[in-house]
């Protein structure tokens, strides 16, 4: 950031948030002064629908045309009028191989009572529900109320096993040994 600030003659203020919902609450509460926010795709759609974001100037984004095909024309903003993909990836299970002797091959390990108090889950309801639904053999995008209730019940069973719900610094929890999954 220092080099960017020097080169462009600006001062960058970084304000982090631990979840999409926290960002949305800040914006709905009247927080201003943001030039850039980094929500997930579903939250970008909500922010666009609620008029919480300004239109982008395409002349300042020359590399937007070089995005990979699967990142072009996203459903929530197909013409990149309000949003440009910043990153894309997947969620998996990180683990301490000195404690978890068998490489996890399913989400089921996150319900193993041997790891009570040593499990960290992302503080992101979509990711967590998605993982639970996948562990049940269901689509992570299901709208079936019965499956969603079943996922909720599984999360309530898991809750006593979880040390932290963290979307920031989860890597540090694992590296320090505070959690093993």
Regions from the PLM with identified roles:
Residues 10, 30-39, 52-53, 115-117, ...:
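Alpha-to-beta junction loops
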Residues 42-54, 76-105, 128-136:
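Periplasmic solute-binding protein
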Residues 19, 23, 40-43, 52, ...:
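Stable alpha-helical elements in mature extracytoplasmic
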Residues 19, 41-43, 61, 97-99, ...:
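Solvent-exposed coil/turn segments that connect beta secondary-structure elements
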Residues 28, 32-37, 54-93, 118:
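A structural signal for short loop-to-beta-strand junctions that line the ligand-binding cleft
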Residues 120-124, 128-132, 139-181:
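Ligand-binding pocket segment of bilobal, Venus flytrap-like solute-binding proteins
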Residues 109-123:
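Short loop->beta-strand "edge-of-pocket" segments that line small-molecule binding or catalytic clefts
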Residues 1-46, 172:
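Early extracytoplasmic/lumenal segment of secretory-pathway proteins
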């Amino acid at each position: 950031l220092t080099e960017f600030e020097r080169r462009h003659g600006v001062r960058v203020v970084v304000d982090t948030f631990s979840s999409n919902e926290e960002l949305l609450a800040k914006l709905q509460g009247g927080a201003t002064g943001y030039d850039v926010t980094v929500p997930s795709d579903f939250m970008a759609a909500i922010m666009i629908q609620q008029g919480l974001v300004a239109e982008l100037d395409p002349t300042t984004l020359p590399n937007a045309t070089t995005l990979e095909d699967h990142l072009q024309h996203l459903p929530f903003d197909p013409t990149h009028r309000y949003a440009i993909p910043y990153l894309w990836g997947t969620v998996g299970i990180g683990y301490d191989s000195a404690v978890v002797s068998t490489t996890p091959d399913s989400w089921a390990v996150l319900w193993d009572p041997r790891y009570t108090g040593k499990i960290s889950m992302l503080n992101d309801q979509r990711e967590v529900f998605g993982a639970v639904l996948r562990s049940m053999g269901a689509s992570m995008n299901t709208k079936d109320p019965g499956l969603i209730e079943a996922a909720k019940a599984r999360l309530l069973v898991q809750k006593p096993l979880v040390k932290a719900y963290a979307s920031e610094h989860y890597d540090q929890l694992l590296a320090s040994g505070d959690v093993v999954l």
